[in-house]
């Protein structure tokens, strides 16, 4: 963690009015500045910024804080990410961070979990290309995916043995306590792989590190799609599938889809700015994450009742994040072709 003196210097060199004015329009009102709150929908400005106190407060929704908390909330940053962003803004070079014992243990755990996820993703990928993975490969082929697309997204297959990955990782020396933290296993009836007989979709963060998985069952078992649980690495509400690729697409919008196959099919068709909300319920955190990379979002959820309702729920969330939104009419499609 950075010293309190260094953090205070970062804050003092970033005038809160200048910083917030880069995100929303502020108007001077007496000794303060006011504007429309970026954290909730409103027609009359209730968001106040005090230059003398270097604080902001919304009288509508109650949020408030200093320049660091504003950047954290608006950009969906961690505390350290916000400090680094503000330091970069004013050309400050930050020293290497010294961590407490607890913080270092947390970092070490996350490093190990990333290592396990990378091994698991590689294992699933090789399973897909093996004789045992033909059912998964056939599924992907029938949906028109090329080898290039399969490789680009690191798609895999989990196999039909419900203990295969567990044994594979145990043979590599990982202990049960660590494996339990990974979210890759269930414990209701002994230790079993969470994903088996499923086509696997590695979920990556913006730095292309595997933080979780999605799996589509081969057959009629339920649920059809299964995601990793929340772990030290994976928070579904703060990530978007495909953003690691889409953020470098250099397009003037992002396309939000419902599922993994929707995104992959979009990318293969040339729409490499497509992402998925890991389910139909878009969150404010995901909307703010998109705002980092674009000002416009195109919604392409399924045209069934659930998809339509999800799109209607998403529109105000995207608007609150400062994103303009358009809904693409998918009624020409009579079935979920990418399922």
Question: For the regions a protein language model found, what residue spans apply to each?
Answer:
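Phosphate-handling DNA/RNA-contact segment within nucleic-acid enzymes
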Residues: 2, 14, 29, 105-119, ...
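Conserved phosphate-handling catalytic cores of large alpha/beta enzymes
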Residues: 282-283, 291-335
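N-terminal structured subdomain of primase-like DNA metabolism proteins
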Residues: 1-102, 158
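Conserved active-site segments centered on acidic
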Residues: 81-132
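Hydrophobic alpha-helical scaffolding
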Residues: 6-10, 57, 61, 72-76, ...
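Conserved small/polar residues in nucleotide/adenosyl-binding loops
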Residues: 3, 333-339
